[in-house]
Amino acid sequence: MVYECQTGVQIEAALMFVLPGYDAFLGFLLIAAAVPVLALVTNKLLAPRSQTGERELTYESGMEPIGGAWIQFNIRYYMFALVFVIFDVETVFLYPWAVAFHRLGLLAFIEALVFITILLVALAYAWRKGALEWS
């Protein structure tokens, strides 16, 4: 099928691609999507099936399980994890800035100072609210 543009140029639809040169990327993407699916299907087909009650037990490093698997734990773990994630993400954002510091100039330095100041205020707030104290 042949189309004609407003400029009079004829384009053959069978050879027209939106992103020419990305064939290798598309192939890689398809393979990357197929490998985990293939691994899961292969596992499902080849894995031994055991109907014993031992299979349903919670694994505790080779020891006999004691009690149930559903236990309560202190909610403060979430607060520590949240504070850790916040400051971990901070380092992820600051690392590229530090690598390119000499090329970015004064404006980027001021922006980084504002970013660090906001995070320090958040840390002070969490500290003041007792989020970092274990009792």
UniProtKB/Swiss-Prot annotation:
Subcellular location: Cellular thylakoid membrane
Family annotation (Pfam families): Oxidored_q4 (PF00507)
Keyword RNA-binding: no
Catalyzed reaction equations: a plastoquinone + NADH + (n+1) H(+)(in) = a plastoquinol + NAD(+) + n H(+)(out); a plastoquinone + NADPH + (n+1) H(+)(in) = a plastoquinol + NADP(+) + n H(+)(out)
InterPro entries given in the database record: NAD(P)H_OxRDtase_bac/plastid, NADH_UbQ/plastoQ_OxRdtase_su3, NDAH_ubi_oxred_su3_sf
Gene3D superfamilies: NADH:ubiquinone/plastoquinone oxidoreductase, chain 3
Protein name: NAD(P)H-quinone oxidoreductase subunit 3
Organism in which the protein naturally occurs: Synechococcus sp. (strain CC9311)
